[in-house]
A protein has these predicted regions:
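Conserved strand-to-loop turn within each blade of WD40 beta-propeller repeats
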Residues: 2-6, 44-48, 79, 86-90, ...
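A conserved positional marker within WD40/Gbeta-like beta-propeller blades
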Residues: 7-10, 19, 27, 41, ...
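WD40-repeat beta-propellers
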Residues: 9-12, 33, 51-54, 75, ...
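WD40/WD-repeat beta-propeller blade N-cap
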Residues: 24-30, 66-72, 108-114, 153, ...
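Loop/turn segments within WD40 beta-propeller blades
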Residues: 33-40, 76-81, 118-123, 163, ...
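Terminal intrinsically disordered, low-complexity extensions flanking WD-repeat/beta-propeller proteins
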Residues: 121, 140-186
Length: 186
C-alpha cells in the first residue's frame, strides 16, 4: 500500500509490477495509509484534511471522514476494527466509529504535529507522539453505550517527554511494552 503526491493510494502485490488497485478521490497528497484488521478495507489520510475508507475488493470509497484542520499524517485502527484514530498537523487526535462514520472523540494535548499513533493489543490505550518531543498515553477503553468516550478531557493518562527527540515510531509489543524511536541530535 502506498500513498502518493498524485492524490492517489495504490494497492500492490509483491508478484506484480502494476498496482492491483488505484484509489483516487483525495484532493491533495495522500500522506498515510493503514489496512483495517480484517484486510478488506484500507484507510487513507491526506493533506486535503480528510480520511477516506476504501473497499479493497472493488476500489470504492465507502466513508469520508472530515473534521481535521490540517494535513493528516498518521492513522491507527483499534484491534477490533471498530474505531479509527487519525492525527496530523492540527495537533489533535480524532477517533472515529467506522460503522457510523461519526467522530466519537477529540483528544487534545500535543503542542506540535502528531506523527505516530498506535493502539495497545487490547485497544484500551492509544499512544501518540510527534514533533513536540513527547509520547502521550490515552485511555480509550471508556466508550459509552453511544460509542463515544464520556469525558475525553480525562483520557490523558500520562506524558513522557523525550530528550529533544521528535517521536517518529511507536510500537506495542505482545506483552504491552511500548517502544518508541526518533532521531537524536546531540
Amino acid at each position: 500500500m502506498t500513498g502518493s503526491h498524485d492524490k492517489t493510494a495504490r494497492v500492490w502485490s509483491t508478484d506484480h509490477i502494476q498496482p492491483l488497485r488505484i484509489l483516487a478521490g483525495h484532493l491533495s497528497d495522500v500522506d498515510c495509509c493503514k489496512f483495517h484488521p480484517n484486510g478488506n478495507y484500507v484507510a487513507t489520510g491526506s493533506c486535503d484534511r480528510s480520511v477516506r475508507l476504501w473497499d479493497i475488493l472493488n476500489g470504492q470509497c465507502v466513508r469520508i471522514l472530515t473534521g481535521h484542520k490540517g494535513a493528516i499524517y498518521v492513522l491507527a485502527f483499534s484491534p477490533d476494527g471498530k474505531h479509527l484514530a487519525s492525527a496530523g498537523a492540527d495537533q489533535r487526535i480524532l477517533i472515529w466509529d467506522i460503522g457510523s462514520a461519526a467522530q466519537v472523540c477529540e483528544l487534545k494535548g500535543h503542542s506540535d504535529s502528531v506523527y505516530q499513533l498506535v493502539f495497545s493489543r487490547d485497544g484500551s490505550i492509544l499512544a501518540s507522539g510527534g514533533l513536540d518531543n513527547c509520547v502521550k498515553l490515552w485511555d480509550t477503553g471508556g466508550f459509552d453505550g453511544d460509542g463515544k468516550i464520556a469525558e475525553p478531557q480525562k483520557c490523558l493518562l500520562c506524558s513522557f517527554p523525550t530528550k529533544s527527540t521528535p517521536v517518529h515510531c511507536l510500537h506495542f509489543t505482545r506483552k504491552n511494552l511500548l517502544l518508541g524511536a526518533g532521531p537524536f541530535n546531540a
